[in-house]
Amino acid sequence: MTHVDIAATIAPEDKLSKTLLKDIKVNEESIDIIELRIDQWPSFNKALLNEVIKQLKIFHLKILVTYRTSVQGGKGAVNEQEYLNILGELIECPQFDMIDIEWSSAVKIEKYTHLVQRAQQKGLEVVLSHHNFQETPALDELKFIYFKMQKLNPEYLKLAVMPKCQEDVLHLLEAMSLTAKHTTCRIVGISMSSLGKVSRIAQGVFGGTLSYGCIEEPQAPGQIHVSKLKSMVSFYED
């Protein structure tokens, strides 16, 4: 059994509204990390990013910044080089704590090595992530994805996949559990949609260390409100 932190995903269109700030405050005890999604912005806006981070600094929570590309289920309509450039700019922003870096087998490993090392040199924790919104690959492929990602030595390995049957959920949980036993990286495994909700609430049973929830509208299929998620995760830790 591992301890599971709760990340609350927010995706503001502009600066944070008073309503959202109030909602974060009300639910602060259920949150360990604020995941700030910025791929919904028309273009990367460093000034706006700094303003939003400044707003979030009133809370004593870690800040994870994520730019999710459309290839992996987000709204960021950018090509590979544009995405890598955005990551490079984010790494030079010192105000937050964690950065999400998408992993893809199509990108040369040298590019990832450079980004991960630069981020870590700047004091950022790296969440190396891979998302498949179409299906759940076979168990061996899930394990191999974790294996290839861990070679980059990030702080977190995150794998999120879409299940089509109960066996898909079980395969994701097994891959997460097996990987957790053989790596020093923190593991995250998410089986999306309602079918896979057990992966969100029982992360710790299978070696997972981070579960993503929402404060307003879910930002991914199957996301649970953070207050409910915290309660459910805690049930397994008692």
Curated annotation (Swiss-Prot):
Function: Involved in the third step of the chorismate pathway, which leads to the biosynthesis of aromatic amino acids. Catalyzes the cis-dehydration of 3-dehydroquinate (DHQ) and introduces the first double bond of the aromatic ring to yield 3-dehydroshikimate.
Subunit structure: Homodimer.
UniProt keywords, alphabetically: Amino-acid biosynthesis, Aromatic amino acid biosynthesis, Lyase, Schiff base
GO biological process: 3,4-dihydroxybenzoate biosynthetic process; amino acid biosynthetic process; aromatic amino acid family biosynthetic process; chorismate biosynthetic process
SUPFAM superfamilies: Aldolase (SSF51569)
Name of the protein: 3-dehydroquinate dehydratase
Species, as recorded: Staphylococcus epidermidis (strain ATCC 35984 / DSM 28319 / BCRC 17069 / CCUG 31568 / BM 3577 / RP62A)
Gene Ontology molecular functions: 3-dehydroquinate dehydratase activity
Pfam families membership: DHquinase_I
Enzyme nomenclature, EC number: 4.2.1.10
Gene this protein is translated from: aroD
Family recorded in the similarity comment: Belongs to the type-I 3-dehydroquinase family.
Pathway the protein takes part in: Metabolic intermediate biosynthesis; chorismate biosynthesis; chorismate from D-erythrose 4-phosphate and phosphoenolpyruvate: step 3/7
Keyword Amino-acid biosynthesis: yes
Catalytic activity: 3-dehydroquinate = 3-dehydroshikimate + H2O
Catalytic site positions: H131 (proton donor/acceptor), K158 (schiff-base intermediate with substrate)
Binding site for 3-dehydroquinate: E35, L36, R37, R68, R200, Q223
